[in-house]
């Protein structure tokens, strides 16, 4: 489903409206927010209004130059990482189109480079992982320990009416499988209290996101 692209000015008006209604934090997500031509301006506008700003991205177009430019305006950097290996990422379709056509992905190397540089600049770091039938048996604990994010959000693959109904059934995991994945990683990372692990099952997500 295609929606009209929001203009620069309309986006700033929306940000101002939510800020004036008492919202103090704003998170830019997608799709892939880094593909939007007005994203940088909107983040800067939100920060100038005093809001806490964050983004969730797969790392597209996230250059060192952009990270340096945005450091005064962007508080939290979130990266979508679903697996501990790029073999799994290739199966899940997380990678650049050319890579995926060859049956490969270099997503982890790109994320590692972004995270290393972003942490030097002092960004807050979040990881987002969607648990599906492809990665439900994966162990991400070593990878998460190596990156030491401030927060790791773990989501259950969510069916969305009119968006992914035709594709999601083969990827869905049961509530029990999701809980097992979450508890397993909480236990393995129990010695790292500085990593906040937050799990959101389907019920939680339906009640959280508009």
Mark where each language-model region is.
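N-terminal pre-core extensions flanking Radical SAM catalytic domains
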Residues: 1, 207-209
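Short, compositionally biased "basic patch" segments
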Residues: 1-4, 71-85
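Conserved alpha-helical substructure of the radical SAM core
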Residues: 1-54, 62-68
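Acidic (Asp/Glu)-rich catalytic clusters
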Residues: 19-20, 69-74, 119-120, 144-148
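A short helix->loop->beta-strand "cap" motif at the edges of active sites that frequently abuts
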Residues: 23, 50-51, 74, 120-123, ...
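Hydrophobic faces of well-ordered beta-strands that scaffold small-molecule active sites
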Residues: 26, 53-55, 77-79, 125-129, ...
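Active-site beta-loop-alpha junctions enriched in small/polar residues
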Residues: 31-33, 58-60, 82-84, 130-132, ...
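Radical SAM enzyme [4Fe-4S]-AdoMet core and its adjacent flexible, acidic
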Residues: 87-207
